[in-house]
From Swiss-Prot:
It catalyses: (R)-pantoate + NADP(+) = 2-dehydropantoate + NADPH + H(+). Keywords: Cytoplasm, NADP, Oxidoreductase, Pantothenate biosynthesis. Its EC number is 1.1.1.169. Substrate binds at N102, N188, N192, S255. NADP(+) binds at G7, S8, G9, A10, M11, G12, N102, A128, E268. This is 2-dehydropantoate 2-reductase. The active site is at K184 (proton donor). Pathway: Cofactor biosynthesis; (R)-pantothenate biosynthesis; (R)-pantoate from 3-methyl-2-oxobutanoate: step 2/2. Catalyzes the NADPH-dependent reduction of ketopantoate into pantoic acid. Its main location: cytoplasm. It comes from Streptococcus pyogenes serotype M1. One of its GO terms (molecular function) is 2-dehydropantoate 2-reductase activity.
Amino acid sequence: MLVYIAGSGAMGCRFGYQISKTNNDVILLDNWEDHINAIKENGLVVTGDVEETVKLPIMKPTEATQEADLIILFTKAMQLPQMLQDIKGIIGKETKVLCLLNGLGHEDVIRQYIPEHNILMGVTVWTAGLEGPGRAHLQGVGALNLQSMDPSNQEAGHQVADLLNEANLNATYDENVVPNIWRKACVNGTMNSTCALLDCTIGELFASEDGLKMVKEIIHEFVIVGQAEGVELNEEEITQYVMDTSVKAAHHYPSMHQDLVQNHRLTEIDFINGAVNTKGEKLGINTPYCRMITELVHAKEAVLNIQ
């Protein structure tokens, strides 16, 4: 198969690197000039569990011409419409498009560009880091769940899961992936935005009595909105999952902290807490915590003059 990685940041590099070890062809797509040039000149430098430099083709999305068998979307959520516009030319009748973006509502965006027959939605707990242009730090293990959005095209989902398992990415075909997507979004909604606003680690947030109260209110808002949309969510189970995750990740600053506080980049808040607030408004459900957190993050972006 010819596999394109649409958005070759840390996670895109992980998937591209691991898939390149199989009998499939991989092309990385990105718009970051320094990253493109570094990989073209020196290869992708991988550190962490393995130390290796691999030659991988990389180009801008608009430069790709060869029809794809599989496209894995890893772009930032706010860049998704532009990416889909840029790669329209490589999407054929049977091209499979797998979305592994964090957050909620991406399937609605993707459907505007791609028939449902071609769309796969998924969620992953793999992690990765970028140490600079062309340098990916890959440590630890993960897994992912995926599902075909078209019930009549489950075979495509199983094919993609098989390919990802060849690359040791621990993929499972999931008959009902949407609750897992919401559960991960809820983890991000309780940790990412809050730690970014409070400038603290996950452990510091959860050690605070007020922090923990806020976390539980956020979980409740995610659950009631998700349930109103018909998603099977159990508040007790999700609360336990969030608590367990907070223990494992106690020393980490989450990715939104890196974006907002450390690197002064725009965040994906509109696709996490903001998505719950927007959905809640449409459903007549009040979500005061998600609304306030979204407004505070946007205010912080404005204060820092992030464009």
